[in-house]
Amino acid sequence: MRKFLMAACAAVLGIGLSAGTATAASAWASRTIVVRPGQSIQAAVNRASPGDTVLIKPGVYHQSVQIRTDGITLRGSGDFYGGTVLVPPKSFPKTLCNAAFGPTGVCILAKSVNPKTGAVIRSVRDDTVTGLLVTRFPGNGVFGYGTDGLTVTRVTAINDGDYGISRFVSTRTLFADDVAIGNHEAGFYVGDSPDADTVVRDDQAYGNQFGIFIRHAREVQVTRNRVSGNCQGILVLDDGQRGGAGNVAIVSNTVFRNNKFCAKSEDTPVATQGGGILLLGATFSRVAHNSVTGNSGSQFNSGGIVVLSAKMISQGSNPNFDTIAFNSAFRNHRADLRWDGTGIGVRFVGNVCRTSVPPGLCH
């Protein structure tokens, strides 16, 4: 998926680089634009100005939505069946998002992008998506690219083809009180952001390939999430790009029975199963006060809390200056705690567990 994204940005976003300039919010009184079943959500979004709310009444909407205006709130009437449900239309609109990133439920896209490189020139700022169920999209559920200050809250993404709830090349993101179930790649994804300044909290991730996936990003907080039934619960990956991955705080999460099997693929060159929390080449990261239980498998990622070099997998870094502290880890296989011995400044402190590789990491 990521390879496709990077190539598509240069090839497709050049078709139409910039969104129209929105009128300043101060020139408008904030409005609520109501959408009812049978009406177009996109038409309401196109009418909205900074500060406006697009309120979607309960119902099933066969629609795909693109947002490129600052300060819009897209508010559904509940992230459950019987609330506001977005499902794929028979024919997807020819938006830049759908062309570049695959058919997507809700896409929040930068105002301006470099046509040659896909680099963000001008972010879209301070948008909110809340109260929706987004399901069965061949691409992504909710997808942000080139956003600043994006909030996604009380959204459920089920059985989407790539990512459930994700953001690329963005900063100041909040994913809170969301649910991601059965998405083909990651339930929650934070990537390609050296200054992510992102919080993923109080979310639930079940039955995805990766529950919560942090790749090529720094300054991320992952806290108070419940993660179960995935091939890998929480992953921080240095994929070899400049800047690496790290400065991630994974704190007070419940990570249990992530025992789904995922075969290797073009995007994932090794099979995965039974992984709780994995730091793969991450640096300057902290894993603390988590409950990690019942994650079992025989793959490279298998175990409760696992710290490995990314050099062999993705030509990334060794796991330098990471701290694994005061976690509870039990009934995990290949071990409750695993470290391949690479890197410098890696510390295991006060962890309550029974098995570790190498021996002696448990308190």
What function would you assign to each model-found segment?
Residues M1-C9:
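Bacterial N-terminal signal peptides that target proteins for export
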Residues G14-L17, T21-N46:
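Right-handed parallel beta-helix/beta-solenoid
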Residues A25-T32, N46, P50, T151, ...:
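Post-signal peptide N-terminal regions of Sec-secreted extracellular proteins
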Residues T32-Q39, G71-P138:
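Right-handed parallel beta-helix/beta-spiral solenoid domain characteristic of secreted/periplasmic
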Residues G38-A43, P50-T73, S77-T84:
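N-terminal extracellular ligand-recognition/capping segment immediately after the signal peptide
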Residues S77, R122-R136, D148-Y163, T171-A186, ...:
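Right-handed parallel beta-helix
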Residues K90-A119, R136-F143, N159-S166, G182-D195, ...:
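Extracellular beta-strand/beta-solenoid scaffold signature
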